[in-house]
A protein has these predicted regions:
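Short, Lys/Arg-enriched, disordered terminal segments
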Residues: 1-4, 305
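ABC transporter nucleotide-binding domains
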Residues: 3-4, 11-206, 211-212
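Short, surface-exposed acidic/glycine-rich loop or hinge patches that mediate macromolecular interfaces
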Residues: 67-68, 125, 210, 235, ...
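ABC transporter nucleotide-binding domain
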Residues: 174-266
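C-terminal coupling/interaction segments
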Residues: 267-305
């Protein structure tokens, strides 16, 4: 069963078409990474899922119920964490969760039980200081606790790790990974390492439509390519090798960093023969040669070219 289904969705702002015939399915129980560059339309899509923005065309269903602009019926299934969550800074975490619980009609007993459990989940149990004194990472964790208060079927997180330091990012990702068995998670990001760490499904938004989608393993198997890292003793050697390899049809791209070059090819075995022959003919001896596994980053860079 799909918790979220999007069919032929389109949205324009003036003459600029942001979303173009977008199709997306989020399976129940998945941790779904929604990838795209800044400005690709990820937040616009999420706002339409929440009924906060009206699509020009297409249909959105949450738990098989249609989403209607301006109505909140389907939001009973959704927990939402915006990219910059806002709070009442004079409150403590438990006071804020109590207020949110009362708004959705939970009893005091349930609020107390859930509040303590969720604060423990996000590592804020025992924190008595006011929210205004929280770090950005602590506020993100409190935002997740609030979004989970009503036991949503779908948790939507908009760039939850984008402004955090490495420790804060790890804390958020650990929380999202922990809840994967009870809640479907959809989170948008442009940090590809976060997706590779916890996601089992991925969709790459580019130019308003889904360019690549599926399970992470399927995408890597079908769409990515092998890469070979070659390190030279000098940049002059690298440039000499680069000039010799410039017209090779087996190569689909390369990247340079200092004295290193990463070469991409869909036929790496054949490419390796060409590479080593070129090295021998040019009398070049690299200090390091290593075969690299396909990565989501290399696929992303290939798609957005």
């Amino acid at each position: 069963m799909n918790v979220l289904s999007i069919c032929n969705l389109s949205k324009s702002f003036g003459e600029q078409k942001i979303i173009k015939n977008l199709n997306l399915s989020v399976p129940e129980g998945s941790v779904f990474g929604f990838i795209g560059q800044n400005g690709a339309g990820k937040t616009t899509t999420m706002k339409m899922v929440l009924g906060l923005l009206q699509p020009d065309e297409g249909e959105i269903r949450v738990c098989n119920e249609p989403v209607r602009f301006g109505q909140t019926k389907t939001n009973q299934y959704i927990g939402y964490l915006p990219d910059v969550p806002e709070f009442y800074n004079y409150m403590t975490a438990i006071q804020y969760l109590t207020l949110c619980g009362e708004i959705v009609g939970l009893s005091k007993k349930i609020i107390s039980q859930k509040g303590q459990r969720l604060l423990s989940l996000v590592g804020l149990d025992g924190v008595e200081k006011r929210i205004g004194c929280y770090s950005r990472g602590m506020k993100q964790r409190l935002g997740i606790a609030q979004a989970l208060l009503a036991d949503p079927k779908l948790l939507i997180c908009d760039e939850p790790t984008s402004a955090l330091d490495p420790v804060g990012r790890k804390e958020i990702l650990d929380i999202l990974y922990k809840i994967r068995g009870t809640t479907t998670v959809l989170f948008s990001t442009h940090i590809l390492s976060d997706v590779e760490r916890i996601c089992d499904h991925v969709a790459l938004l580019n130019d308003g439509y889904i360019a690549v989608g599926g399970t992470l393993s399927e995408i890597k198997a079908l769409h990515s390519h092998d890469s070979l890292l070659i390190e030279f003793s000098s940049e002059a050697d690298l440039q000499q090798f680069k000039a010799s390899m410039a017209k090779q049809p087996l190569l689909i791209g390369s990247e340079e960093k200092g004295r290193e070059m990463i070469i991409h090819s869909r036929e790496m075995k054949k490419a390796q023969h060409t590479i080593f022959s070129t090295l021998a003919e040019a009398d070049l001896a690299p200090v390091k040669v290593a075969l690299m596994e396909p990565s989501l980053e290399s696929l992303f860079l290939e798609v957005i070219k």
